[in-house]
């Protein structure tokens, strides 16, 4: 069961890596006339694979009263019965009896005893460091362009492959922590990559020496991580506990922030954290509190004045240090995810879908610290996978939609809709590159079209081609080479592959068998902040 919109690689491992509990597309039904199983046994059979044996989360979020506080029980029952299309959660109405669903719902709203905790002492005690790593050679110990390196996360068997972006040959393959978040983060020199796992582990890996440097567990159920633009800081966003944790570059804990309102009366899961390099800060979205936080790693950051302060004269407010302090921006509603415009002056985020179908996208000015516009995108825009590019003399945003087969194009000066581009079905990822006139997007949320990749001309905003995989198999997540000449897609299956396409002719060039390559990330495009990929 899933009660959040979450990255689909979580689903990938849920359905295929956990044996009997995730054996097939439809779980085994309770035999007719059989005595009702205990609720704990039902949970272990149908839910534990994704949400953890103790309900503390894994591929899916934690199922605890505090994490379900905003979901009413009748709505939870409906989710279990009907599934949730946005996360590809399977429906259980034909698998479980009504009384079993009701019992499961009641049970996940009861507290876990003893209550799960993860303290600063636990974080510090979890840290592991490889001896002698500071003496390792300061250059790549392999022959390839280190800037055209791809890091490929294989969710099928929890491995990472390092791929030469020129020859498309693997350089190295190593095992990873379970259920990595799909977005590894790189240091600006390209030497180190940081991985975050859903069960809270952060791994620092030396790409030049092909060895793990250090690991630490930031929480029990972690959303994602960010690395500062100068490579000196790492921040983790947790669902459980409700914290944001700051580390130095060696993964030594520096500070833990309780994700609460200013008065401390309400706490929240943390939706996401991203680095805003030009601002020398991390920006944090809270899932249950309508606030956006900015935490500066600039020692010269101006002081913070909480509350209604009209100017900064003595007596108007008590200042807090700006360096590593929390600067709060109040919102109308919480954001599930967000990304930045190219100037990093604005955060573009999406709240949960509104019941009346009205747009839920928001534009937040980080300097004015307030919402300045509503994005005219209905449904469930996946802004975190949107891209920006120039069109007809203006900058536009193009965003896929988790609910509709539509790419919405928004003018970033007026925040008005330019065009809706139809696709075969709802999609998750959209990617492009400065050196190509085309953008690629998937339809992986559409059962009958998940094998189709749509190619859109950025000059005309029209679809010009489709790339198709085998029907019934998911083709998703494009990433370009450093020069933009080739596009790499994932055949998102346990017996899957990494498929290399010519970005100009759309012809397949090469296919490398891989175990569910849920994401691949070009080092140069990431550290150079390419407009065609996520950062």
PLM segments and residue spans:
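Asp-box/WD-like beta-propeller blade repeats and closely related beta-sheet repeat scaffolds
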Residues: 218-291, 308-326
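Flexible coil segments in periplasmic/lumen-exposed cytochrome c-class electron-transfer proteins
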Residues: 25-37, 44-46, 90-156
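Extracytoplasmic electron-transfer domains, predominantly the class I c-type cytochrome c fold
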Residues: 30-33, 49, 54-59, 63-113
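Residue-level detector of Asp-centered blade-edge/turn motifs that repeat once per structural unit
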Residues: 144-146, 188-189, 229-230, 277-278, ...
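Loop/turn-rich, solvent-exposed surfaces of beta-rich toroidal or solenoidal domains
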Residues: 426-496
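A short beta-strand motif characteristic of beta-propeller blades
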Residues: 169-175, 211-216, 253-264, 322-330, ...
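Repeated scaffold domains used in trafficking and secretory/extracellular systems
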Residues: 132-133, 137-140, 180-185, 221-227, ...
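Short loop/turn segments that connect beta-strands within beta-propeller blades
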Residues: 165-167, 206-210, 248-252, 297-299, ...
């Amino acid at each position: 069961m899933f009660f959040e919109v979450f990255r689909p690689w979580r689903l990938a491992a849920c359905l295929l890596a956990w044996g009997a509990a995730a054996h097939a597309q439809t779980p085994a039904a309770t035999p007719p006339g059989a005595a009702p199983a205990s609720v704990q046994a039902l949970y272990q059979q149908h839910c534990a694979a994704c949400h953890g044996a103790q309900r503390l989360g894994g591929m899916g979020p934690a199922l605890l009263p505090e994490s379900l506080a905003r979901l009413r029980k009748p709505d939870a029952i409906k989710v279990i019965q009907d599934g949730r299309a946005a996360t590809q959660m399977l429906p259980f109405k034909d698998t479980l009896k009504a009384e079993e669903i009701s019992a499961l719902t009641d049970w996940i709203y009861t507290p876990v005893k003893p209550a799960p905790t993860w303290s600063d002492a636990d974080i510090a005690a979890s840290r592991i460091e490889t001896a002698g790593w500071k003496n390792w050679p300061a250059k790549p110990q392999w022959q390839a362009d280190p800037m055209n390196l791809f890091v490929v996360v294989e969710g099928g068997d929890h491995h990472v492959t390092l791929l030469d972006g020129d020859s498309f040959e693997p350089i190295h393959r190593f095992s990873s922590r379970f259920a990595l978040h799909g977005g590894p983060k790189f240091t600006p020199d390209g030497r180190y990559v940081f991985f975050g796992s859903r069960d809270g582990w952060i791994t620092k890996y030396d790409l030049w020496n092909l060895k793990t440097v250090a690991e630490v567990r930031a929480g029990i159920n972690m959303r994602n991580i960010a690395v500062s633009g100068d490579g000196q800081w790492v921040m983790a966003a947790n669902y459980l506990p409700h914290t944001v944790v700051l580390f130095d570059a060696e993964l030594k804990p520096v500070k833990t922030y309780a994700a609460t309102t200013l008065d401390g009366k309400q706490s929240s899961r943390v939706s996401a954290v991203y680095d805003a390099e030009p601002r020398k800060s991390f920006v944090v979205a809270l899932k249950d509190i309508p606030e956006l936080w900015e935490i500066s790693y600039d020692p010269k950051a101006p002081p913070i004045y909480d509350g209604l302060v009209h100017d900064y004269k003595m007596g108007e407010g008590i200042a807090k240090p700006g360096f590593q302090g929390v600067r709060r921006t109040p919102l109308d509603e919480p954001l599930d995810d967000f990304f930045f415009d190219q100037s990093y002056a604005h955060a573009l985020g999406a709240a949960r879908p509104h019941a009346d179908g009205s747009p839920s996208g928001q534009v937040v000015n980080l300097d004015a610290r307030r919402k300045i516009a509503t994005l005219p995108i209905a449904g469930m825009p996946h802004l975190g996978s949107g891209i920006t590019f120039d069109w007809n003399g203006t900058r536009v945003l193009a965003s896929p939609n988790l609910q509709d087969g539509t790419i919405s194009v928004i003018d970033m000066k007026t925040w008005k809709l330019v065009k809706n581009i139809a696709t075969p079905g709802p999609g998750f990822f959209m990617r492009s590159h400065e050196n190509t006139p085309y953008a690629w997007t998937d339809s992986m949320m559409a059962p009958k079209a998940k094998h189709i990749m749509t190619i859109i001309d950025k000059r005309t905003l029209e679809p010009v081609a489709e790339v198709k995989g085998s029907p019934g198999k998911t083709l998703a997540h494009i990433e370009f080479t450093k020069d933009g000449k080739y596009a790499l897609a994932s055949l998102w299956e346990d017996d899957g592959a990494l498929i290399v396409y010519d970005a100009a002719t759309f012809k397949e060039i090469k296919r490398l068998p891989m175990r569910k390559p849920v994401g691949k990330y070009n080092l140069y495009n990431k550290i150079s902040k390419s407009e065609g990929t996520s950062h």
